[in-house]
Amino acid sequence: ATVSCFLNEGYEIGSVGTIMPDVEVKIGEENEILLRGKTITKGYYKKAEATAAAIDKDGWFHTGDAGYLKGDQLYLTERIKDLFKTSNGKYVSPQALETKLAIDRYIDQIAIIADQRKFVSALIVPVYGFVKDYAKEKGIEYKNMEELLQHPKVIGLFRARIDTLQQQFAHYEQVKRFTLLPEPFSMERGELTNTLKLKRPVVAKNYKELIDKMYEE
């Protein structure tokens, strides 16, 4: 069933469209998108258990997708199963945060870390050319990229830019600590799929030492 669509006007970047007239939408636990209406399925054919799992007693269909409403516009963030749950019980949408931060000209790749952790952190692959330009502008001397990325001025630059971009997120969703990587994520090390999507378990394994260091007191 069609839940939302784009009209000839009122288009919002990032939205999946305006809610259709005959469809009810609400946001449930874990920011799950719930649907109800004449065009929404009443159940799965000859699959009573699947129907009971998907449709609650009030008739709301549980999509398994996380998102939010802004006026009459619907925004989809990601699948519920892809959400991270911090050790404090808060749910974090890694893709939403990564997408937002990746618009920065200094950030090439980013991996959000939060699952079963006390707070959100990030592994960041900078756009090395822009960082070199910044170093030249600020008169920063360095022997190699690893040394440059540990310079206080460079770290301060990324801290300020990240904080500006993540203002729209709740405090518990925001990146508290980050590490700048001297090499990009790669398919050769199994960190990316052939469509360049992150393989999170592989990234977590390959960078375990760096990740653990960000959570040291």
Regions found by a protein language model. Name each.
Residues 1-13, 47-50, 128:
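Active-site loops of AMP-binding adenylate-forming
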Residues 19-86, 114:
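Conserved ATP-binding/catalytic segment of the ANL
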Residues 66, 71, 104-130:
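C-terminal boundary motif of the adenylate-forming
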Residues 109-112, 118, 159-217:
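Conserved C-terminal "lid"/linker of ANL adenylate-forming enzymes
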